[in-house]
Amino acid sequence: MTSTLNTLKSNSGSRKKKLRKGRGIAAGQGASCGFGMRGQKSRSGRPTRPGFEGGQMPLYRRVPKLKHFEIINQKNFSIINLEKLNDFKDNDTVNIDSLVKKGLIFKPKFPLKILGNGKINVKLKVQAHSFTKVAKQKIEDAGGSCELINNK
């Protein structure tokens, strides 16, 4: 027999009927509907919220909030955008010391990273610990050079 669209049927047992609870004991889920006799879990409005421990102070409230938790191996940088480097003259060398003298960096606590925001109009020799791809491209397009410093 060939099957056509009007004769298609689903396999037996593949479509289960919905359990109708509370519709008599013959259905198997009558009276207490499978929730047992008494107690909080048999009442209406159930279930309790996630993390509820029966009135005891829950774990997520017992444990202190860890504020100012330091990320392990996090790399911090002193960052400078390219537009700030326009304060220098042509063929100047830009490094942490020259940036401190100009007042662009206050405390040379972290390694220097050059970001590519803005345009650069001067030819500079930039010495930094890290460059973004865009920053390196823009410095070299302006006729300058980028030199990576090793920080140990």
Swiss-Prot record:
Residues 14-23 have a biased composition (Basic residues). GO terms for molecular function: rRNA binding; structural constituent of ribosome. It holds the Pfam family Ribosomal_L27A. GO terms for biological process: translation. GO terms for cellular component: cytosolic large ribosomal subunit. NCBIfam families: rplO_bact (TIGR01071). Binds to the 23S rRNA. Part of the 50S ribosomal subunit. This is Large ribosomal subunit protein uL15. It comes from Prochlorococcus marinus (strain AS9601). The gene is rplO.
